[in-house]
């Protein structure tokens, strides 16, 4: 009986081996000579496995539990997935918090070392058409948690069509994801503490998607490192992107949380739902935007540190349209929004909790120029609510609720409509500039 059972087991094992050979779509990096000991350079072995999968027409290159040291960089061929053990993005804040998991304690961890001292150079992982990075931790062991950061190239670059980053922890890259020059990128379930830049989007002509991304100082909040990040870091940067979709994203502790800028390729338009920025010197900056707009809904913005903590800043260079709907703004900032440019900015059904600066006399929303719409919003402090500068071309301020008295300073020479606002106290007289 025992001999019979052994023969059955051997037969099953052989059948499994035959099946693997017959369908060579999965490649274990251990079979290509990786050490996974955190010391031996595994770059060449990983690339050999990736190239084998690419030559076969695609497949999954699997990196089992281990600490894989890289002195170089990787290129993931078309239709190849580089996958670690994680099915959901993990958390490793043990370097910051004693007793919690460290990045080398478990799972699949890539120790990245190439390019220290310069942002120039290839990304650690370059994804191409239909290729994916999934289920791994990227950790830069030579970055000092107690000092100003050393520059590195991008951790991940996304190229071609439909590249994807799924369930990846970028614990402490200098630059996170370069999502430029591709079509239909997908970034989902990504967490970590990118220090200088989190995600950069540009040169996108077919819809990119970013979902469930959370940047927080889990690796280090020590004064020298974290203050540098607060003075220099930008979490999400968008330049030319047509129909960008962003959903459920959050960042903490940056100079700018969300930045919309203009590159030589153009500007961004898109749908931004459930986005958040906490303890950023400026939560959201618009340098320029498309005429068909940035549609921002259910946002949560908090600013209270820095030389002039401001939730929203729309720059003089903006010519496009920006809409904030059902957003909340709190934290002892100086101002909720400072608006310039020739574009249109609208706030609808928003809640403004704190503003005014130390003296309490700065308006929540200060528009210097352009077109402004503020409708159905709640101002929860008895402080100056709105100031319209002389270069404001058009404005509608209607159906808002004010704590205390209405304090609207209208210096505009343009067409301004103010009405149907409700205040606790007697409304202040509307200046003669109301037209």
At which residue positions do the language-model features occur?
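Extracellular beta-strand-rich solenoid/capping regions of secreted or surface-exposed proteins
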Residues: 47-55, 68-83, 87-134, 139-162, ...
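Acidic Gly/Asp/Thr-rich repetitive segments characteristic of extracellular carbohydrate-active
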Residues: 29-64
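Bulky hydrophobic/aromatic "packing anchor" residues in well-ordered structure
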Residues: 28-29, 82, 418
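Bacterial N-terminal signal peptides
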Residues: 1-12
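Extracellular beta-rich repeat passengers
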Residues: 117, 135, 139-435
């Amino acid at each position: 009986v025992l001999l019979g059972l052994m023969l059955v087991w051997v037969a099953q094992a052989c059948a499994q081996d035959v099946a693997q050979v017959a369908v060579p779509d999965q490649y274990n990096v251990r079979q290509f000579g990786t050490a996974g000991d955190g010391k031996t350079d595994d770059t060449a072995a990983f690339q050999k496995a990736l190239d084998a999968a690419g030559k076969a027409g695609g497949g999954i290159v699997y990196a089992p539990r281990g600490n894989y040291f890289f002195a170089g960089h990787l290129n993931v061929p078309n239709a190849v997935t580089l996958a670690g053990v994680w099915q959901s993005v993990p958390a490793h804040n043990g370097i910051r918090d004693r007793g919690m998991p460290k990045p080398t304690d478990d799972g699949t961890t890539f120790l990245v070392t190439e390019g220290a001292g310069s942002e120039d150079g290839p990304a650690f992982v370059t994804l191409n058409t239909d290729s994916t990075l999934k289920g791994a931790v990227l950790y830069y062991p030579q970055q000092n948690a107690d000092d100003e950061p050393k520059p590195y190239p991008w951790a991940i670059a996304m190229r071609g069509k439909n590249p994807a980053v799924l369930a990846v922890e970028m614990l402490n890259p200098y630059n996170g994801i370069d999502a430029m020059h591709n079509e239909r990128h997908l970034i989902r379930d990504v967490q970590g503490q990118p220090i200088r830049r989190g995600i950069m989007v540009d040169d996108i002509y077919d819809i990119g998607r970013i979902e469930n991304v959370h940047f927080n100082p889990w690796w280090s909040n020590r004064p020298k490192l974290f203050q540098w990040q607060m003075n220099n870091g930008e979490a999400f940067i968008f330049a030319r992107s047509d129909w960008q979709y962003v959903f459920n994203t959050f960042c903490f502790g940056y100079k700018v949380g969300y930045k919309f800028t203009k590159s030589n390729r153009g500007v961004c338009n898109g749908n931004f739902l459930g986005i958040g920025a906490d303890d950023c010197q400026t939560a959201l900056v618009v340098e320029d935007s498309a005429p068909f707009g940035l549609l921002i809904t259910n946002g949560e913005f908090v600013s209270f540190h820095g030389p002039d903590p401001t939730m929203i800043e729309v720059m003089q260079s903006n010519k496009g349209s920006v809409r904030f709907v059902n957003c909340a703004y709190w934290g002892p900032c100086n101002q909720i929004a400072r608006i310039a440019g020739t574009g249109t900015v609208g706030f609808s059904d928003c809640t403004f909790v704190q503003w005014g600066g130390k003296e309490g006399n700065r308006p929540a929303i200060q528009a210097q120029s352009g077109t402004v719409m503020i409708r159905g919003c709640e101002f929860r402090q008895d402080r100056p609510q709105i100031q319209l500068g002389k270069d404001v071309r058009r404005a509608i301020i209607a159906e808002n609720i004010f704590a205390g008295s209405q304090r609207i300073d209208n210096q505009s020479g343009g067409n301004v409509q103010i009405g149907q606002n409700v205040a606790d106290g007697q409304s202040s007289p509307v200046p003669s500039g109301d037209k």
